[in-house]
Amino acid sequence: MFGADKGTADKLDGKKLHIGIVQARFNENITNTLAAACRAELLRLGVQEKHIRHVLVPGALEVPVALQALAERDEYDALIALGCIIRGETYHFELVANESGAGVTRLALDYQVPIANAIITTENLDQALARQTEKGVDAARVAVEMANLLEELS
């Protein structure tokens, strides 16, 4: 929802955090902007450049596999999934959107690591372009907030 009230978070301090980013290359013009906005926001929140691991995969269905590999290393306080799925003329859109989303959620629960899911799903390119920067920033903020929350709860 564009312009939705996302509330205010108190603990957006990333100074001590290690963050892993997995970016799908499919629709690369969009995902590159997502990644740039995400990285810039992580740095603004205090995450050190050397504590950000950024890997690329072919598409959204491969994102969970790379997230799992990072989660298994147990080196990251939070992970971020970046991708862009634009509806086409076939059922493939639903398949990719549902399976990638379910995979990301399952990994977060199985590994007890926060994963900010910014695999955006849109009806068309214009919607993707309108969301690419904001969703990258949101993903960084979610990752930092949830990493801090889980640290507080442990």
From Swiss-Prot:
Catalytic reactions on record: (2S)-2-hydroxy-3-oxobutyl phosphate + 5-amino-6-(D-ribitylamino)uracil = 6,7-dimethyl-8-(1-D-ribityl)lumazine + phosphate + 2 H2O + H(+)
Class of enzymatic activity (EC top level): transferase
Residues annotated as binding 5-amino-6-(D-ribitylamino)uracil: F26, A60, L61, E62, C84, I85, I86, N117
Pathway assignment: Cofactor biosynthesis; riboflavin biosynthesis; riboflavin from 2-hydroxy-3-oxobutyl phosphate and 5-amino-6-(D-ribitylamino)uracil: step 1/2
EC number(s) stated in the UniProt entry for this protein: 2.5.1.78
SUPFAM superfamilies: Lumazine synthase
Entry keyword annotation includes Iron: no
CDD domains with a match to the protein in the record: Lumazine_synthase-I
Active-site positions on this chain: H92
GO process annotations (BP): riboflavin biosynthetic process
UniProt record similarity statement: Belongs to the DMRL synthase family.
Protein name, UniProt field: 6,7-dimethyl-8-ribityllumazine synthase
Species of provenance: Acidovorax ebreus (strain TPSY) (Diaphorobacter sp. (strain TPSY))
Gene behind the chain: ribH
